[in-house]
C-alpha cells in the first residue's frame, strides 16, 4: 500500500479501523455521555487533510453556536476536548453555556496523516500508512487511552473531537455510526443498555435511540 497517497480501498480501511478498535473494547461505567464533532473548517468544506492549526470557518462558528444551543438544556458535568484548534474552539463555545472550562486531551486528536496533510481527502483510506504520520494501530491505541481518560471525568461528559475519533469510539464500544451522524457540530448521545451501547443524534435521543451495531 502506498505510503504517500491514500489508496481508494475505502471500505476495507474503515473496516480495519473498526476491527482494531473492537479487539480492545472500552467499558465506560457511566450511563450516558455526549459526543460533538468540531464545527466546519475550510479544509472540511474542500475535503483536504488538515493541520492542527486549522480554524473554524464562518459556517463552523455558526454550527458551534447552534450545537451550544442544542446542548444548553442538557446536564453536562465535564467537557473534554481534543487540543486541536478546531475542536478546542468548538468546545469553548459550548462550555460558555455551562460555565465550564474544557479539559484538553491530546489523546482525542484526529489521526495524524503526516505528509498527506494539505492533499485531498476525498478518497481517504483509513488503512493507509502515511509518511510521517500515524499508523492505524497507533491511532487506535492513542484514541483508546484518551477516551478512557476523558470518560473517567465526572459524568455526564461531553467529548468534543473529530470524525476519526468518533469512528474509533464506535469500534471501541461495539456500535456502528451511520454517515448521517457524522456531520460537523452535530451533538450525539451515547446510552448504555446493559453491556451494549446505543447512539443517536441528540434531537432523536429522547426517542428509542438507534442501535447501530
Q: Where on the chain are the PLM-derived regions?
A:
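Phosphate-handling substructures
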Residues: 43, 54-55, 96-145, 200-202, ...
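Active-site catalytic microenvironments for nucleophilic, acid-base chemistry
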Residues: 70, 97, 149, 172-176
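Active-site signature of alpha/beta-hydrolase-fold catalytic machinery across serine-
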Residues: 93, 168-172
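Catalytic metal-binding/acid-base residues of hydrolase active sites
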Residues: 40, 85, 108-109, 164
Amino acid at each position: 500500500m502506498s505510503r504517500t497517497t491514500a489508496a481508494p480501498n475505502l471500505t476495507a480501511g474503515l473496516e480495519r479501523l473498526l476491527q482494531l478498535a473492537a479487539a480492545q473494547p472500552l467499558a465506560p461505567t457511566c450511563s450516558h455521555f455526549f459526543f460533538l464533532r468540531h464545527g466546519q473548517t475550510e479544509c472540511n468544506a474542500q475535503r483536504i487533510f488538515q493541520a492542527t492549526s486549522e480554524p473554524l470557518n464562518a459556517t463552523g462558528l455558526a454550527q458551534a453556536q447552534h450545537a451550544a444551543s442544542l446542548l444548553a438544556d442538557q446536564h453536562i458535568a465535564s467537557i473534554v476536548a481534543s487540543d486541536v484548534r478546531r475542536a478546542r474552539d468548538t468546545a469553548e463555545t459550548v462550555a460558555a453555556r455551562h460555565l465550564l472550562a474544557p479539559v484538553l486531551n491530546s489523546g482525542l486528536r484526529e489521526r495524524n496523516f503526516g505528509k498527506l496533510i494539505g492533499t485531498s481527502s476525498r478518497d481517504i483510506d483509513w488503512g493507509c500508512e502515511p509518511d510521517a504520520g500515524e499508523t492505524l494501530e497507533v491511532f487506535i491505541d492513542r484514541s483508546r487511552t484518551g477516551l478512557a481518560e476523558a470518560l473517567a471525568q465526572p459524568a455526564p461528559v461531553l467529548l468534543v473531537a473529530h470524525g476519526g475519533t468518533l469512528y474509533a469510539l464506535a469500534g471501541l464500544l461495539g456500535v456502528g455510526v451511520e454517515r448521517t451522524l457524522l456531520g460537523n457540530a452535530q451533538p450525539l448521545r451515547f446510552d448504555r443498555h446493559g453491556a451494549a451501547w446505543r447512539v443517536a443524534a441528540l434531537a432523536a435521543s429522547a426517542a428509542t435511540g438507534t442501535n447501530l451495531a
